């Protein structure tokens, strides 16, 4: 399925976004989003899609990942200064909806040890799941830093009740090539999720947190 966004248009938009952020330096790292408008789609009737794709470059380096770990994982997390909670700490939340909601808000994503992942519904109730942040599995065979980077590089497309959505695909300190590759990957993946592919795409824009939104499509 070929992309309807030409390489030239892609780079024009990427450069416009990066240039705008250089001209007006903010005192925080601006995130770059892909904003998507859909058409010929009825959120009531049509199946709401959701899917995740791993990008080549981490879009949000400051993303906070918390490890819900067994003893070994918690020790490892502490040595890496990664936020971490053990089963005891989770029990203390006592399934309190407010506290679980607060936890879900505090972190962008969670990873959990095998022994803990099965206990999460029992320990925390459905709160993390409702927030769309049910933990990914962290095994002892893989490197924690690699796994965290993988989580940070993964973006999620989720169709809700409205016909527009936006996802973080990068930040303004990326090179044009890095940002362009992430945007290209994101668009192709999104289009593959749509029932009628490009016929469901009304518009695509790119936008940094504070910048103008050049039109990709």
UniProtKB/Swiss-Prot annotation:
The keyword Ribonucleoprotein applies. One of its GO terms (cellular component) is large ribosomal subunit. GO terms for biological process: translation. SUPFAM superfamilies: Ribosomal protein L1 (SSF56808). Pfam families: Ribosomal_L1. Keywords: Ribonucleoprotein, Ribosomal protein. One of its GO terms (molecular function) is structural constituent of ribosome. Belongs to the universal ribosomal protein uL1 family. PANTHER family: RIBOSOMAL PROTEIN L7AE FAMILY MEMBER (PTHR23105). This is Large ribosomal subunit protein uL1. The lineage of its organism: Eukaryota, Metazoa, Ecdysozoa, Arthropoda, Hexapoda.
